[in-house]
From Swiss-Prot:
Transmembrane segments: none annotated. Catalyzes the ATP-dependent conversion of 7-carboxy-7-deazaguanine (CDG) to 7-cyano-7-deazaguanine (preQ(0)). SUPFAM superfamilies: Adenine nucleotide alpha hydrolases-like (SSF52402). This is 7-cyano-7-deazaguanine synthase. One of its GO terms (biological process) is queuosine biosynthetic process. CDD domains: QueC-like. Zn(2+) binds at residues 191, 201, 204, 207.
Amino acid sequence: MTDLPRAVVLLSGGLDSATCLAIARDMGLETYALSVAYGQRHAAELTASRRVAHALGAREHRVASVSLGEFGGSALTDPAIAVPEDAAPGGIPVTYVPARNTVMLSMALAWAEVLGARHIFVGVNAVDYSGYPDCRPAFIQAFETMANLATKAGVEGHPTTIHAPLIDLSKADIIRRGVALGVDYGLTVSCYQADDDGRACGRCDACRLRREGFAAAGIADPTRYQAR
């Protein structure tokens, strides 16, 4: 029996990364899910990531830790900075975590090299997104170039491909794709300030994009919201 090619999938526990995991599985790849505890205030997403990894048949799921909260600079890691509850007026919002995707992709790259995996999946999106600089196609292309210059696998002729299959999709299109692939979005948590039970605030930018996406897709929103 031929071994399936391997892929490392960054899995936050949210809607987009769950869809990425389903896409990688649908491509016939053996999936290894990597979640990162980086000091985020919405730690319920890590619990969600375990549910999603199990439901979508990841070969292995690991939760790695890195203390981005030590540096602060983001509403997601610094409790002194409030999470905005209105749509961002433009520019890079305070929910941007400095260098987060660079750090996480580097961790995924390290595990991929150990596994002999030539594919890394990340759920960044440049359409319905919040203005983050590390969610753009130029960033993904630049990271892939760096990855193949900086690793033993790359210089020995075994290049790594960084897949960002959602990058040009609307949130509604992402949801439709995931539903077609059997993703149970009721298992996921997107909210920036979800409570310990994973219930969403319904007011932050992540909640707004998620709610609007389900509405535009014409699909019932399975999100559990906190009582107001």
